[in-house]
């Protein structure tokens, strides 16, 4: 029997994601597969903040190269890591049903962000999170926090940080306990990254099983995530810039919330659009236009200096 080769990063969370797709392939598509671990640029360079490494696709480039060579059949990504413009010949075969989209506060000593003392050190990999933390608490010190989920938790528990911010979806997938205090921010309190909580399966568009993999697609999640990706694409952005965007469906209505600003919490733009689902992509363009008129491009250029 033919076996598909799934390319995956080697972290515990990435392997959970790859195994999740492997199990669904067997159950829903009657297809066997095996996992090949691939080290990406983002995995190799751990002593620098992600925004300082430079370039897009820090966690996807090497996987995409193997897809183009035909060395693997599909690559499983956290959708938030997937660049909005694909290498020629590649595309997403499916976007899975979204898990919890929220960001989560974790601390050993303090119950929430507002209870942290002045000058407390908060660890995060994300300029988007730093920006929204600083928007609420200018007196906090946000610092880069690299490594897998367990490594980050150990740094919290040994006192390197007073608090850290992680994605709730990853914590739930790994069934993470640890940290005395754990509190998820609402989407309004901290707008997530594009695609947060969803997995994206990338393949060659002409792969013979590309259509088959669409059985794993979740229509509602895919629709919302594509709206978010369209917004990021319009700003020529990626996952290492201070932008949050979240689209949600409520019956036939869609709501798109977005935030953009400097990592220090200054010059922040926050806007939202609501309307009929049939006008969803028009609403994205209207929101983009409002952001651009408010100086979004100039703010993003300044953000490159941080």
Predicted regions, residues:
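Small-molecule-sensing regulatory modules
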Residues: 2-46, 52, 135-306
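A conserved helix-loop-strand patch within extracytoplasmic ligand-binding domains
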Residues: 79-80, 88-140
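Short, Asp-centered acidic motifs that coordinate Mg2+ and/or phosphate
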Residues: 72-76, 162-163
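Short glycine-rich anion-binding loops that position phosphate/pyrophosphate groups of nucleotides
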Residues: 79-82, 169-171
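Extracytoplasmic loops/domains of multi-pass membrane proteins
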Residues: 66-68, 82, 87
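Short, structured active-site "lid" loops
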Residues: 48-73
């Amino acid at each position: 029997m033919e076996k598909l080769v799934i390319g995956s990063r080697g972290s515990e969370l990435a392997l959970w994601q790859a195994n999740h797709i492997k199990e669904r392939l067997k159950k829903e598509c009657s297809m066997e597969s095996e996992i090949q671990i691939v080290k990406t640029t983002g995995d190799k360079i751990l002593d620098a903040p992600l925004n300082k490494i430079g370039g897009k696709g820090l966690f996807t480039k090497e996987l995409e190269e193997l897809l183009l060579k035909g060395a693997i059949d599909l690559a499983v990504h956290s959708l938030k890591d997937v660049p909005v413009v694909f290498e020629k010949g590649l595309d997403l075969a499916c976007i899975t049903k979204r898990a919890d989209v929220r960001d989560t506060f974790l601390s050993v000593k303090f119950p929430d962000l507002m209870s942290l003392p002045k000058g407390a050190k908060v660890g995060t990999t994300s300029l988007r999170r730093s920006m929204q933390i600083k928007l609420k608490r200018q007196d906090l010190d946000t610092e880069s926090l690299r490594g897998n989920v367990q490594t980050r938790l150990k740094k919290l528990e040994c006192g390197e940080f007073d608090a850290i911010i992680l994605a709730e979806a990853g914590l739930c997938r790994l069934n993470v306990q640890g940290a005395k205090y754990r509190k998820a921010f609402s989407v309004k309190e901290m707008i997530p990254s594009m695609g947060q909580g969803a997995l994206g399966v990338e393949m060659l568009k002409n792969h013979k099983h590309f259509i088959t993999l669409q059985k794993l697609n979740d229509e509602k999640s895919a629709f919302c995530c594509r709206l978010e990706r369209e917004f990021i694409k319009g700003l020529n952005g990626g996952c290492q810039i201070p932008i949050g965007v979240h689209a949600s469906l409520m019956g036939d209505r869609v709501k798109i919330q977005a935030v953009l600003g400097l990592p220090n919490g200054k010059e922040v733009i926050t806007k939202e659009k609501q309307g009929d689902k049939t006008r969803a992509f028009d609403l994205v363009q209207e929101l983009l236009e409002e952001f651009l008129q408010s100086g979004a491009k100039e703010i993003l250029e300044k953000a490159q200096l941080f």
